[in-house]
Amino acid sequence: MGKKRRISNKLLLVGAIFTIAIPSVSYAEEVISPENFKSSSNLYEGRNTTVLKTSLYPDTYNYPFNQQFISKLKEANTTIKKVDKRDDENPIISTTLSFIRHMNSEDYKSAFDLTSRSLQKIISKEWLKSYWEGLPVQLQAGSFIEIGEVTQKETNPVHTNVEIQLVFEKMTVPLLIKLDPSGKIDDFQLSMSFSPVAERPSYSKPESFVDKEVVVGSGAFPLPGTLSVPKENGPFPAVILVQGSGATDQDETAFALKPFRDLAEGLASKGIAVLRYNKRTYEHGLKTQFSPFYTVDKETTDDALLVTQFLKNEPLINKNQIYILGHSQGGMMLPKMIEKDQNKNIAGAIVMGGPARTIQDVVLDQFEYLFSIGAMNLDQYKFYKSQFELLNDPNFSGQNPPKDFYLGSAVFWDSIRKIKAAEMSKEQKTPLLIIQGERDYQVQSKIEIPLWKEQLKERDNVDYQLYPKLNHFFTEGDGEISKPDEYYSPANIPEYVINDIAAWVQGKSQLN
């Protein structure tokens, strides 16, 4: 197997995404060590860092945080429902089973024939072979044994999602396969599915709002979403929810947490319409992976602005009261959205756990904390520190990166490395609400909030709200600073956060 195909396997270990770590960093999808970066960095030039998947930490699976998740995958081996021998009459399930069976029997042509025309433009039979052979190696899972439970999950106007459990010697791994309306496989990625997940929050009042299935955009990257609209008489102010980095669904599902579902249902229960959507890197992971010269604007900014224009045409929405809430990297990109909002569609913006500084500076502080609690060793910390120093060099070029730059697409990094959200917001006029959990170890309030306040001290339309008990995903916990494994515990965003956001939006709406 050639080196390039081995690297491609690593690019495809797509799972849940850790907002504000390395851009498009996964929780537990990559196992690329610094040594592997160095031996293969030239293969990444011009690639899409959105699915490059440089690991949350190098050698991700070795950390206690992710070992806890892996141990849960291993436990699933004893309880999985075997269906490989079953003849399933459901054509969606049948196609999914056939796809895996063909690859396991090394019939990659038949597997390839089950994929959509759009996917066939970017992958090949040889690529499928490389992916399948490399999967257990990258996961350190041992030999493939059999297919486990197959579940038809979400169906939206763009894709029908099927989760299939792949039973290996050492663990059972969920693979999320997306089929287009014609029944062809259009995308697939590892799924960091987790059980149990947080239940619907008590403050959600489903009887008070209606969920409307929508599709934003067309062409290669249509994005399915949900518009939650109050049942009262409109028009209503609306909030658009923009995720952090990586491949996240419309609920911004992070292990046991669903923060965007909580926000959407909570705000809709209080008379505010909310639109949330699957991120491009989640709905079209493989296509974005192979898109040349992928930038942070393509990952985050442009789709968010497309959604604002979409809402302008919704009859139940107050066209002058469209707000954007950006979480984590989404919050960091809000000033860029405001800058590019030529039609002045954005009435106000809510920065939810968004950094004031460059992402590489924020991540370095995050890694220092992880090193201090034993979640990262010294060599790994030094490796990333050296990489971030290259990004901070004014002469860094995405088109001609240093030979010792190993973090993936230099084009993507060049598009994001200079963004300083607080500084960009200094001269802008759009009202801001900046909310921050004080226990957040990923975007640390003791560093970021003073910088926001210093840069915006001359502005009179910026409000701040700090929450002593909340972490990066705005759920409560104990201790001065949160730890990564906190995200495994099902929890909801507290109602007091919903109340604060609703009061701010409704207050601004009444002024106009």
Task: Place the predicted regions along the sequence by residue.
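Cap/lid segment of the alpha/beta-hydrolase catalytic domain
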Residues: 242-272, 276-298, 370-371, 476-486
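Alpha/beta-hydrolase active-site loop
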Residues: 293-314
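Accessory cap/linker subdomain of secreted extracellular hydrolases
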Residues: 348-427
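Short beta-strand/loop motif that positions the catalytic acidic residue
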Residues: 428, 434-436
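Short alpha-helix in the alpha/beta-hydrolase fold that links the catalytic acid
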Residues: 444-455
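Catalytic active-site module of serine/aspartate enzymes centered on a nucleophile-bearing elbow/loop
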Residues: 473, 479-512
